[in-house]
Amino acid sequence: MPPSTDSSRRNSEEGFSDGFKLDSSALNKPPEEVFDIVGKLGEGSYGSVHKAIHKESGHVLAIKKVPVDTDLQEIIKEISIMQQCKSKYVVKYYGSYFKNSDLWIVMEYCGAGSISDIMRARRKPLSEKEISAVLRDTLKGLQYLHDLKKIHRDIKAGNILLNTDGIAKLADFGVAGQLTDTMAKRNTVIGTPFWMAPEVIEEIGYDTKADIWSLGITAIEMAEGRPPYSDIHPMRAIFMIPTKPPPTFKKPEEWSSEFNDFIRCCLIKKPEERKTALRLCEHTFIENAPGCDVLQAMILDAQEKVLLGQAPVAVAGADATLLSEGMSTMIDGGDATLVQYKDNYVTAQSLRSQMESLKIGGEIPKSAYGSSRNNGSPRVQPPGHTASACDPSNNPPFAEEGTGPNFQIGTSESSYKDASYNMMNTEAEYENRFQRAVCDGDFEFLRNITLDELIRRKESLDSEMEEEIRELQRRYKTKRQPILDVIEIKKRLN
């Protein structure tokens, strides 16, 4: 394990252990003999998440059920990263089971849900004090991860969970990455579009500083109810983030100078000039953050609104997770994560070795050995399989950009519109349906739209295309001009 500072280790591990663990005998039993599933918490990018009770101890847990034929090697990577993390600011991993065609991942249960759930339940963004308290815990979690040379790569309000003690924890390591000594920076496009750092989008290589940019966007999301650019199509946002100045508050004067400065420190275009998580923990805005009691009061307010029927969420008990209609709790599914995966082939022997080290019980399902449903996703090869020159694993690691089943771009998270904070973003829903239609060729839904609306959308589409062309031309000239200048200089010298 890479070394980390003593202070960060103390900050991350103080009060961490909850005393619960799964022993080898429990891992060797069928999961239904060990747990009672008591309710569904939500749907995520890899599968569904459920609330469960450990039969022997009564301990409340969260279980993520993942179809094995989706992306097994990526799930193994997620488990590996979770298992290595021992911080009270990172969701704890206890063990996993194979059950039929699913992998059950047993994790710490966070009874108050995500920050996104809280905002939806209260139908309003967070206050400045609430935001600073959430950011303090999140920064401690990021400091811990970054000390271990790990990048989360998907920081957003939907991936910050709260327990009922008012402690914020980082969750969803499905796209997290490890920085090794031989790979100082990654260059894969991965994350959620609106929260992506410019260097991630441009694929020029990135490191832990990418998480800091995403944290700054998340701070704006918590303050305004939605991230910057969420009112436009994600593809346009991906184009604009690297070319436009760093985003700021819509009304900076409504927030303290300390908060404005914190956002500025996070959202610096050049990653080398961005502060680290450790340095941001020393920022005045974070140092003056209130205690957990502020977040406990926020959670209580959200739960009261649920119980009074003032929020579009379901509640299953005093410590129930806040559930939004059509939205996930453990993993926010409303704003899909953009991922490019390698087509890794894994032998059953290597997978079994990983399973043993990661506390995974049960037998590898047959579906893990590849099927027509894999559609190019990483899969496991049966025992005895050896790589050959014709193996796809020997081909270039990524498909052409924007192609393949793992290229996912979703619409923005349910937005808060006007004073009423409408929970349905009709523009986003239209764009979502339109993008699906582009893929499957079924544009039948357009028949239900009025002529005036169709004309309006066509005119809007034309203007958007013209603006994107102008942006592309400006970007092209910016790249082309230095080359022309150097050519001219060389001609003069000759």
Swiss-Prot record:
Its EC number is 2.7.11.1. The keyword Kinase applies. PROSITE patterns: PROTEIN_KINASE_ATP (PS00107), PROTEIN_KINASE_DOM (PS50011), SARAH (PS50951). One of its GO terms (biological process) is regulation of MAPK cascade. Its cofactor is Mg(2+). It catalyses: L-seryl-[protein] + ATP = O-phospho-L-seryl-[protein] + ADP + H(+); L-threonyl-[protein] + ATP = O-phospho-L-threonyl-[protein] + ADP + H(+). Pfam families: Mst1_SARAH, Pkinase. The active site is at D154 (proton acceptor). Residues 443-490 form the SARAH domain. Residues 35-286 form the Protein kinase domain. Gene3D superfamilies: p53-like tetramerisation domain (4.10.170.10), Transferase(Phosphotransferase) domain 1 (1.10.510.10). One of its GO terms (cellular component) is cytoplasm. Proteolytically cleaved by caspase-3 during apoptosis which results in kinase activation. Signal peptide: none annotated. The record marks D332, G333 as: Cleavage. CDD domains: SARAH_MST_Hpo, STKc_MST1_2. InterPro entries: Kinase-like_dom_sf (IPR011009), Mst1_2_SARAH_domain (IPR024205), p53_tetramer_sf (IPR036674), Prot_kinase_dom (IPR000719), Protein_kinase_ATP_BS (IPR017441), SARAH_dom (IPR011524), STE20/SPS1-PAK (IPR050629). Keywords: ATP-binding, Kinase, Nucleotide-binding, Serine/threonine-protein kinase, Transferase. ATP binds at L41, G42, E43, G44, S45, Y46, G47, S48, V49, K64. SMART domains: S_TKc (SM00220). GO terms for molecular function: ATP binding; protein serine kinase activity; protein serine/threonine kinase activity. Residues 369-378 have a biased composition (Polar residues). Residues 1-27, 364-413 are annotated as: Disordered. Serine/threonine-protein kinase which extends lifespan and delays tissue aging, probably by activating daf-16. Belongs to the protein kinase superfamily. STE Ser/Thr protein kinase family. STE20 subfamily. This is Serine/threonine-protein kinase cst-1. It comes from Caenorhabditis briggsae. The gene is cst-1.
